[in-house]
Structure formats: structure tokens, C-alpha cells
């Protein structure tokens, strides 16, 4: 059985800028240049400005916009003798993160949540695989053992600095149906939300 898994990863985010200032003109204590003179200035207009200083979102550092994770070849007999087959690790690397800091490099109140999107498998904790292979699904787990569910937000991950590696394990698991040899693939997306 030849196993191949493709994961195109999509990153969504936005940066928002907004602020407020609307003081008198000229500000108290400031005089206009002498050559302006009151007779040359019309004082019947007003401009209001507003803005906000925000922390920008992290940037996603990937070698390629489409990560392809090769699960290798697995004999059917290996899957018949257990619940799961091969595992592969992959990471989502975030860089240039600017979050609330309480000194040093400790970013104590900034967290992110990741959501994986794809076609649900036979149970909510599995993703469907396409192709000729039958009887298997894909499962994603984070480093704490939390299992991803299609379209459901995973537990929050605290950020510890301006560069983060979000590590996950992909594994092929049985889905209760009859095993059949063949190729398989899946296309999954993900979303990162900041708190």
C-alpha cells in the first residue's frame, strides 16, 4: 500500500489600525508662524483624526505554501494488526509575534487557537481520506495529545516568545471498515486565532 498525504495549509489573519485624536487647533501654547497672520487664515473648518496602536499578527514561516507530507508505504498486514499505522510530524512555525509581555521574554497573556478544516472521517476525531485505499482515516494530534476535530477549535496554546513552532503528529488510523490497498490523500486547511 503506497501512502501519500498532501496538506495545503492556509493561514488567515488581518491587521487592524484605528485611533482617536480630535483636539483644538492650534493646541494650547502653540503659536502660528508670524507670516500667517489672522487675516490670511480661515478658522471655520475642523479636521478630526483618530487611530489605534495594535500588535500585528504573527507571520507564518513555511518553506512552501503547500506542505506535502509523505506518509510512505504501509503493508495492509501492519494495519490489520493494530489500530494505527504510520505517523509523521509536521510543524506550523510562527514568526515576528508581538504580544503582551510582563518583562523579559515571557508572554503570559497571549494565546492562539488552531482549527483544522477538512472532511470529517467516520468519527469526529478523524479526517476523511480520498483515493483507492479503504478502511483508514487520518488523525491529527498536538504535542499534548489533544486530537483535532474537523472545524473545531483546539485547546489554546500559550505563546512564549516572538517565534513559535506548533508541532503536530499525523497518523493513519483504522476506521472500522474493511481494509483495501491503494493510494490515498487528503487536503486540509487550518486557521490560527489570537487571544
From Swiss-Prot:
Belongs to the fimbrial protein family. It is found in: Secreted; Fimbrium. GO terms for cellular component: extracellular region; pilus. It comes from Escherichia coli. The keyword Translocase does not apply. Residues 1-22 form the signal peptide. Disulfide bonds join 58-97. The lineage of its organism: Bacteria, Pseudomonadati, Pseudomonadota, Gammaproteobacteria, Enterobacterales. Fimbriae (also called pili), polar filaments radiating from the surface of the bacterium to a length of 0.5-1.5 micrometers and numbering 100-300 per cell, enable bacteria to colonize the epithelium of specific host organs. PapH seems to anchor the pilus to the bacterial cell. In addition the stoichiometric relationship between PapH and PapA determines the pilus length. This is PAP fimbrial minor pilin protein. The keyword Manganese does not apply. GO terms for biological process: cell adhesion involved in single-species biofilm formation. SUPFAM superfamilies: Bacterial adhesins. InterPro entries: Adhesion_dom_fimbrial_sf, Adhesion_dom_sf, Bact_Fimbrial_Adh_Pro. Gene3D superfamilies: Fimbrial-type adhesion domain (2.60.40.1090). Its main location: secreted. Keywords: Disulfide bond, Fimbrium, Secreted, Signal. Transmembrane segments: none annotated. The gene is papH. Strains of E.coli that cause infection of the human urinary tract produce pap-pili which are hair-like appendages consisting of about 1000 helically arranged subunits of the protein PapA. These pili mediate binding to digalactoside-containing glycolipids present on the epithelial cells which line the urinary tract. It comes from the Bacteria.
